[in-house]
Design a protein with these regions (language model features):
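Transmembrane helix boundary and interhelical loop/hinge segments in multi-pass membrane proteins
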Residues: 48-53, 69-91, 102-103
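Membrane-interface alpha-helices at helix entry/exit sites of multi-pass transporters
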Residues: 94-106
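Aromatic- and glycine-rich beta-strand/loop motifs that create alpha-glucan
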Residues: 1-27, 275
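Hydrophobic alpha-helical transmembrane segments of multi-pass membrane transport/permease proteins
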Residues: 18-40, 57-69, 171-182
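Hydrophobic/aromatic residues in alpha-helical transmembrane segments
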Residues: 65-72, 120, 154, 183, ...
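Membrane-embedded or membrane-proximal helical elements that form or frame transporter/channel pores
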Residues: 41-73, 245, 249-252, 256-261
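Secretory targeting signals
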Residues: 34-38, 46-64, 105-166, 195
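Terminal transmembrane helical anchor/hairpin motif
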Residues: 37, 41, 181-271
Length: 282
């Protein structure tokens, strides 16, 4: 059995997950309803569709990680708990084959789910408005796929480090809280915590570049910044804090840097997860 065989077998098994398709179907129906009911204010059909997808991006930022985590949290932990990993490694396959095969299959599952979600939203938006800004929709899909892939990578990496379902669930829930909710909950988000430590505890002068840099470490914030790269000029949204109207953020806080944030969140968790899996006692 090769890496491709592992990926194909796991894809076939994972796509039967009722929880995964329940989440994807619910999200697809929700986006279709939003697309049907959305109407732009004094805008033409094409700009209305662009604003629609821009608005749905806020919802995707919170819900797409759930799709990715549900699809991937048991990728390797499930095999370890059931003992199936010993069968896979005895065929023979290397641990690298198992790790990459599982990653590829879960990416395939999530991509299929995302295609379904975007297809339903796009079909409803076109039927409602009679316009399709192909470049913007394709760009939003690409950015959303990249964002979702980050959480697939994180989930597979975490799954490779644990051997029990309960721990895999705890790791998935914890990652969602730390990387998503902690950046959006009013009063306790990461930027406020960084500001409190920097100013109140350490006694330094306010440094909004520092607070924004801390905020930019989240895949969610990177996703919101990346959406500015695919919408027409004038429809971008402010994502980071602006202490004053005249504030000009440094280059490392630019929208383009969101791609680097994604790259780091793809590479580092996978490297650590593979390293832990390679040395695990199975």
């Amino acid at each position: 059995m090769t890496l491709r065989d592992i990926a194909r077998k796991d894809f076939t098994a994972a796509r039967r997950s009722r929880a995964l398709w329940a989440v994807a179907t619910l999200l697809g129906l929700l986006t279709a309803l939003i697309a049907f009911g959305y109407s732009g204010y004094r805008t033409g059909p094409e700009e209305t569709v662009i604003q629609l997808f821009r608005a749905m991006g806020g919802m995707f930022g919170l819900l797409l990680p759930i799709v990715a985590l549900v699809a991937s949290y048991m990728a390797i932990a499930g095999e370890r708990e059931s003992g199936g990993v010993k069968f896979l490694l005895g065929l023979p396959n290397s641990r690298r084959d198992v790790f990459l095969g599982k990653l590829a299959s879960r990416l395939g599952i999530v991509t299929a789910g995302l295609v379904f979600i975007f297809a339903t939203a796009t079909a409803m938006a076109v039927a409602r408005n009679g316009a399709l800004p192909v470049g913007v929709v394709a760009g939003m899909f690409a950015v959303s796929l990249l964002y979702t892939s980050v959480f697939v990578a994180i989930a597979v990496a975490l799954s490779a480090t644990v051997a029990e379902r309960s721990r895999a669930i705890a790791a998935a829930v914890g990652s969602y809280f730390v990387l998503v909710l902690l950046y959006v909950i009013p009063g306790v988000n990461v930027a406020l915590l960084a500001r409190f430590v920097h100013q109140t505890l350490l006694g330094f002068e306010p440094n909004f570049d520092l607070y924004n840099a801390v905020l930019f470490t989240s895949p969610l914030i990177a996703y919101r910044k990346a959406m500015n790269l695919v919408v027409p000029s004038g429809l971008e949204r402010e994502v980071l804090q602006r202490p004053a109207e005249s504030y000009t953020p440094p280059g490392y806080l630019g929208d383009e840097m969101s791609l680097l944030v994604f790259a780091v969140w793809l590479a580092v968790p996978l490297a650590i997860g593979y390293w832990r899996f390679e040395g695990a006692d199975l």
